[in-house]
Amino acid sequence: MHYRDLRDFIAALETRGELKRVGQPVSPRLEMTDLCDRTLRAEGPALLFEAPQTGNTRYASPVLGNLFGTPRRVALGMGAENVSALRDIGQLLAMLKEPEPPKGLRDAWDKFPLYKKVLDMAPKTIRRAPVQEVVEEGPEVDLARLPVWHCWPGDVAPLITWGLTVTRGPAKKRQNLGIYRQQVISRNQVIMRWLAHRGGALDFRDWRRTRPGEPFPVSVVLGCDPATILGAVTPVPDTLSEYQFAGLLRGSRTELTQSLGNDLQVPAFAEIVLEGHLSPCEAGFSGVSEHGIPLKEIDGYLHALEGPYGDHTGYYNEQDWFPVFTIDRLTRRPDAIYHSTYTGKPIDEPAVLGVALNEVFVPILQKQFPEIVDFYLPPEGCSYRMAVVSIRKQYAGHAKRVMMGCWSFLRQFMYTKFIVVVDDDIDTRDWKEVMWAITTRMDPVRDTVLVENTPIDYLDFASPVSGLGGKMGMDATNKWPGETDREWGRPIVKDAAVAARVDQLWQTLGL
């Protein structure tokens, strides 16, 4: 089933028993996080809070939380019925990432419908967009009227978490979609927390170089259809826009409308859009925001001190400086739904997303490394800091080649600290088997690869330097000649005929 907007998805989830409406007053300050966290850990439904209230303040917008709280709901959002079907999406992305020339006329004819479908999914623009039915400008913009979550007791301020940020570099036709958290620092300002390698930050870097001193346009979308949301967190090839990929997932072209104050396109059937800019400022400027947050000029633009916030690591992160997004205009539906989430100690909603998107990664890796049988990012490892890879080993040193390949092939794995490589007789998703392989097939000195001074997640306080740290690879495969001089162990295998007889006997024993 495919969904035109967030409301279509909500209705479908409710029909399936995958969404619960909460009519009692619940506060976006701490309470919604606690309720969603308990519900997620119980593998419960999405929650639609219909009466958000903090103290005497009642909010007009209902709040949607725990939307992608189970892998199945992620799959449904991507147009699939179950998580295993996401491998098909991964195969499509693998082909689009590195398309192979047709092997002949028949092969070209077989591939033509797929390429035509991709071309046919270019987004279309409409003028009268539901998301622009209500327009608030200038002094009318007040983020305090939105039920923005204050997720954890130690968080410095309310935080926009599911903002789909739309940017475009000065020399690019394609827009970039990214999801970056945004700290509220005044009625119309937030901090745009994006790391230097992310698409929005790269667009802003190019803008500063080519158009210094000019406001950088940004639009932030809150609450759009699931295909567009998930397209923004999927490793889409550079040749394909996220909007086009969302159309492929949905089975229909993404309907966009131009922002009223800039040339960025946003989903026409979204709930809320924040339009504005990153602000240039005078050299040497320093001050404080309306909410008392330190401000200063960096590279000609206004920045603010962000954090601390509870993060997906399960800890509060360090403070750092990021650019300030000034909101000139807020457009919305008359009865807009505010979509939010939280990040915390795994397993949280981003970790669940990681479990589902793991299935998308596997075919992409297999196209580059056909010897890979499975690839698993355990959610307990923050969904990206540890990977377990099983391979059909073919030569000495093969495991180390796969480690290096995984670290370098997709930018999504740049921050993976630990990679364990096992043989194809080991289930990567069964820790008992992985531990057995590590403890019986590994020598700690011979089979451990340590790499120093590599890019590391900025949030990883365990690294010796912010953004720079080590990586460890563990070769837990059976060793080949050249890797050991010793006779290698022969695994115990049950007699097949005896096992078959015992299978029959087992049914009669009542054990």
From Swiss-Prot:
The keyword Metal-binding applies. It is found in: Cell membrane. It is an enzyme of class 4 (lyase). Binds 1 prenylated FMN per subunit. InterPro entries: UbiD (IPR002830), UbiD-like_C (IPR049381), UbiD-like_N (IPR049383), UbiD_bacteria (IPR023677), UbiD_Rift_dom (IPR048304). GO terms for molecular function: 3-octaprenyl-4-hydroxybenzoate carboxy-lyase activity; metal ion binding. Its cofactor is prenylated FMN; Mn(2+). Pathway: Cofactor biosynthesis; ubiquinone biosynthesis. Keywords: Cell membrane, Decarboxylase, Flavoprotein, FMN, Lyase, Manganese, Membrane, Metal-binding, Ubiquinone biosynthesis. Mn(2+) binds at N176, E242. One of its GO terms (cellular component) is plasma membrane. Homohexamer. NCBIfam families: PRK10922.1, UbiD family decarboxylase. This is 3-octaprenyl-4-hydroxybenzoate carboxy-lyase. It comes from Laribacter hongkongensis (strain HLHK9).
